A protein has these predicted regions:
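Residue-level signal for secondary-structure boundary sites
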Residues: 14-16, 61-63, 95
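Glycine-rich beta-strand-turn "strand-cap" elements at beta-sheet edges
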Residues: 2, 38-49, 74-96
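Short, well-ordered beta-strand segments in beta-rich or mixed alpha/beta enzyme
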Residues: 2-9, 38-68
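Short amphipathic alpha-helical segments
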Residues: 14-37, 70-75
């Protein structure tokens, strides 16, 4: 199990619109990928401009097997709403 932890800077005035567009493009795309488990969107408790995407994958290999061309197509579909996140990756050591 691997967790992809992305942090986006999103203007609070644009948050709801951005979340809807992000869900329409990125969430629907990810749901179709082999190895995708789950995705949640979190707002930082101490900074309302920070939105965190927590994405669970069955394995790093499945996550990294997504073709770059497919990722590029989603970026293009997001248009001006695409945001470059900071990213961290976590590997599961123990469950429970």
């Amino acid at each position: 199990m691997v967790i992809e932890f992305l942090t986006f800077d999103v203007d609070p005035a644009e948050r709801e619109t951005w979340l809807q567009i992000e869900e329409r493009h990125w969430s629907r795309f990810l749901e179709q990928q082999d190895g995708f488990v789950s995705k949640q969107m979190w707002q930082s408790a101490d900074d309302e401009t920070k939105i965190h995407a927590v994405i669970w994958w069955e394995s790093m290999e499945q996550w990294k097997a997504i073709p770059q061309e497919a990722l590029d197509a989603v970026v293009e579909a997001m248009g001006p709403h695409e945001k470059e996140p900071s990213m961290k990756v976590y590997n599961l050591l123990r469950d429970g």
